Every structure is written in C-alpha cells, then in structure tokens.
Regions:
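Long, contiguous binding/interaction regions
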Residues: 1-79
Length: 79
C-alpha cells in the first residue's frame, strides 16, 4: 500500500458532485480528509489517500479528467 497527501481544488461545476465518494467507491482508495474549505463557487480539500500505487495513479488520473486540480502536499496539513 502506498500513501500520498494531495490538495484537490474543485471548479464551480463540480462543487455539488460526489467526487470523493466516487473515488472511494470506484477505486477502493482509503481517504482521510485533513482540511477542507467549500464555498458556493470554489472548493478545496487536503487529504491523504492510501491504496496500491497503480490504483492511486488511476484515481488521480480520473480526478484530473473530471477537471479537479491535484497538487501534492509535501508537509503536514495540520499545523
């Protein structure tokens, strides 16, 4: 199992979509939400994802295809 930390930034068109639910359900990725901020027109979430390396790669590719910006987090998001 591989664990990674990422920040997901959602465009307005995806704010109401169950993106994280689909990530967990469709890709069997374990997530841990560390911090988030969601407004009517913008949202982001910092989270840890854990799964097999190829599963994480597929999940991240799917997020990007949907229009989610995926940025790696190098340090702990809880400070």
């Amino acid at each position: 199992m591989t664990r990674t930390r990422v920040r997901l930034t959602f465009p307005p068109s995806l704010i109401q979509e169950p993106i994280l639910y689909r990530l967990v359900k469709d890709f069997d990725i374990v997530i841990n939400i560390r911090r988030a901020d969601v407004k009517a027109d913008y949202g982001w979430v910092a989270l840890e994802m854990e799964a097999a390396e190829e599963t994480l790669a597929r999940g991240v590719a799917w997020l990007k295809e949907r229009g989610v910006q995926v940025d790696p987090i190098e340090r702990d998001v809880i400070a």
